[in-house]
């Protein structure tokens, strides 16, 4: 069957699923890391499952009922997700009101088999919109449900879980933890194998040293008084197109041949691919040699920051920024760019630098209208653990982020499996980057 021809033949009415039992009421503050203007949107995700019979756990007669019940039970533990974001009277900050109102759940059916979606399904997950709830404006997060789930039943007995979650509540690792809680309970566990921890106070800003604050104010003045000439900022959103590329193990070997000998044994796939993409993107966009270009990468604070407790599901990704002129980036070697990426990663792994980045966030929150020009944002989510989504009576065969669009323009790097079962790297970029220095197989 051609994928273009499939359609969701039935979609039920959206319903609110509340926690299965009474949960605490009250207000929970967000961290300064959560309450970032750039995180005020609903992040989509797709997970594809094939029905299996393992002999011990047979598929329920109505998988949708089992998932709905598991969702309600998971919300007993993750009860803030069943609440609503409210804006506080002062400063425009957000907080979660734990109201127990619930999350949105939809059941649907599609006239298609799991193998018709790809063996296995790979981005761009064509037809992805059919597997996701209609959330309206994904950039509006106040006063609305914080989580949406659609289960689409397929002809073969498999199904697709399409979700949206408010990024202010959880990052990729936290979202996976919540999904795993639902899956654990659907598998038959009495409770999630990892119990959630809120504790957003771990990422609260302290006072800034005067010299740092002064430097930041100068940067704001410079950005506010500069006329924007970056096509990636001025181009209308409707003209932006998401593009996904896959990198096989053979492709990575080819890329590594361009790495200096002293780095070949230690460079990570993230460092290498990020360096290649940043350089290629900069060249493709035609920036002037004297202009400053920036790279923003993500560093996971888990395991590094004040011993974050097991079960913490809030935002824990910090984003150092590298600045360099176009000339210096493009005329120096690939090894030089890799060293820049590596240096930024390692410098951000100190508690002092992590705290400084959190301390700067309130200043940026006061100026949400400021757009940083010529910046490439990339995020490594290869190892968040999606393969651990084990329902028992259904096996996850693929999934990931289906679309990337405004307000989120991040280039995500994540892992999938190809038709041979081998792991391949998937990355996203915009349609402006069409001329990579190496031929990369495009799916």
UniProtKB/Swiss-Prot annotation:
Q: What are the transmembrane regions?
A: none
Q: A GO molecular function for this record?
A: hydroxycinnamoyltransferase activity
* Enzyme class (EC, first level): transferase
Q: Which UniProt keywords apply?
A: Acyltransferase, Transferase
Active-site positions on this chain: 167 (proton acceptor), 390 (proton acceptor)
* Pfam families reported in the protein's UniProt record: Transferase (PF02458)
**Position of the signal peptide:** none
UniProt-listed Enzyme Commission number(s): 2.3.1.-
> Superkingdom of the source?
Eukaryota
State the similarity comment.
Belongs to the plant acyltransferase family.
Say what the protein does.
Answer: Hydroxycinnamoyl transferase that catalyzes the transfer of an acyl from p-coumaryol-CoA to spermidine, to produce coumaroyl spermidine. Can use feruloyl-CoA as acyl donor. Contributes to the natural variation of spermidine-based phenolamides in rice cultivars.
Official protein name in the record: Spermidine hydroxycinnamoyltransferase 1
What organism is this sequence from?
Oryza sativa subsp. japonica
